[in-house]
């Protein structure tokens, strides 16, 4: 498989656009930070692919967050990213999770929150219930509510690789639902193994060899964590100084860990004094 690449394409004979994402390294970095149960590894892979596909639809520079929450054994699964296709994610759960657990089994009464944060302009947030059998269907529901353009997704993950495909009707005065349904029928024949092993040109040829397809230059997808020593210091400063000094007195240091990438930032007494005096820590230990 071509690793960590998103491809966009257009149908010249229909007002429909498509996306194809294939992920391996970035997926492994997301799920490698914690000992996730297999079903959660698969869910995070699908969520990572979905977020990458959603990110490619952004018409601005900025950030995106796709968050699943609920009152079930999985309380949170989230992928954060930006328009440069830099992604990171985590999940939180309790107890054992069955390999065949459904979305309802995992999240109970759950919902999906998609937050778009432009570098300039107002933030947008959309919320849909996790009341469909698959994550792909829930994302389709989001598009139906927010953009009201016919949209379809196919998401796959197996703990090693993740992939997804996306079709959407372009805004137009004409009715292209028949074209869209035809292309969806073709796309629905895709198999996970094909997405995990073939490059984009081969996949598109197999699916759409009788269609006129224009494939654009590939876009690299990567794992990127935004944690830093400065952010950790800022987080410490929000805590009461006496509480932090009590930790320092007991442990001789204050340690901050990143849930996304497992980086650790260690602050000694001099650092803590500097944080509350100036807002930064002097040391560079990580």
Swiss-Prot record:
<dbReference type="GO" id="GO:0044183">
    <property type="term" value="F:protein folding chaperone"/>
</dbReference>
<keyword id="KW-1015">Disulfide bond</keyword>
<keyword id="KW-0963">Cytoplasm</keyword>
<keyword id="KW-0862">Zinc</keyword>
<dbReference type="InterPro" id="IPR016153">
    <property type="entry name" value="Heat_shock_Hsp33_N"/>
</dbReference>
<comment type="similarity">
    <text>Belongs to the HSP33 family.</text>
</comment>
<dbReference type="InterPro" id="IPR000397">
    <property type="entry name" value="Heat_shock_Hsp33"/>
</dbReference>
<keyword id="KW-0676">Redox-active center</keyword>
<feature type="disulfide bond" description="Redox-active">
    <location>
        <begin position="258"/>
        <end position="261"/>
    </location>
</feature>
<dbReference type="InterPro" id="IPR016154">
    <property type="entry name" value="Heat_shock_Hsp33_C"/>
</dbReference>
<protein>
    <recommendedName>
        <fullName>33 kDa chaperonin</fullName>
    </recommendedName>
</protein>
<comment type="function">
    <text>Redox regulated molecular chaperone. Protects both thermally unfolding and oxidatively damaged proteins from irreversible aggregation. Plays an important role in the bacterial defense system toward oxidative stress.</text>
</comment>
<feature type="disulfide bond" description="Redox-active">
    <location>
        <begin position="225"/>
        <end position="227"/>
    </location>
</feature>
<dbReference type="Pfam" id="PF01430">
    <property type="entry name" value="HSP33"/>
</dbReference>
<dbReference type="GO" id="GO:0042026">
    <property type="term" value="P:protein refolding"/>
</dbReference>
<dbReference type="GO" id="GO:0005737">
    <property type="term" value="C:cytoplasm"/>
</dbReference>
<dbReference type="GO" id="GO:0051082">
    <property type="term" value="F:unfolded protein binding"/>
</dbReference>
<keyword id="KW-0143">Chaperone</keyword>
<dbReference type="InterPro" id="IPR023212">
    <property type="entry name" value="Hsp33_helix_hairpin_bin_dom_sf"/>
</dbReference>
């Amino acid at each position: 498989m071509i690793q960590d690449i998103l491809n966009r394409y257009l149908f010249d004979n229909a007002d429909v656009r498509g996306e194809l994402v294939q992920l391996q390294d970035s997926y492994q970095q997301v799920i490698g930070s914690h000992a996730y149960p297999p079903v959660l590894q698969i869910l995070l892979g699908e969520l990572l692919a979905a977020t990458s596909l959603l990110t490619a639809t952004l018409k601005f520079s900025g950030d995106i967050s796709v968050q699943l929450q609920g009152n079930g054994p999985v309380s949170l699964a989230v992928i954060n990213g930006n328009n440069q296709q830099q992604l990171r994610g985590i999940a939180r759960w309790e107890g054992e999770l069955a390999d065949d657990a459904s979305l309802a089994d995992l999240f109970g009464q759950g919902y999906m929150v998609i937050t778009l944060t432009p570098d300039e302009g107002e933030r947008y947030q959309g919320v849909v219930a996790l009341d469909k059998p698959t994550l792909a269907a829930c994302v389709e529901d989001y598009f139906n509510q927010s953009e009201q353009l016919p949209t379809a997704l196919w998401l796959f993950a197996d703990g090693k690789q993740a992939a997804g495909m996306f079709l959407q009707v372009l805004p137009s005065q004409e009715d292209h639902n028949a074209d869209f349904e035809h292309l969806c029928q073709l796309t629905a024949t895709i198999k996970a193994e094909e997405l995990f092993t073939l490059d984009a040109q081969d996949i598109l040829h197999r699916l759409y060899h009788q269609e006129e397809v224009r494939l654009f230059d590939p876009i690299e997808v990567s794992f990127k964590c935004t944690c830093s020593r400065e952010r950790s210091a800022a987080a410490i400063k929000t805590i009461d100084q006496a509480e932090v000094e009590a930790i320092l007195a007991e442990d001789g240091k204050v340690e901050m860990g990143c849930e996304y990438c497992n980086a650790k930032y260690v602050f000694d007494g001099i650092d803590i004094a500097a944080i509350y005096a100036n807002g930064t820590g002097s040391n560079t230990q990580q």
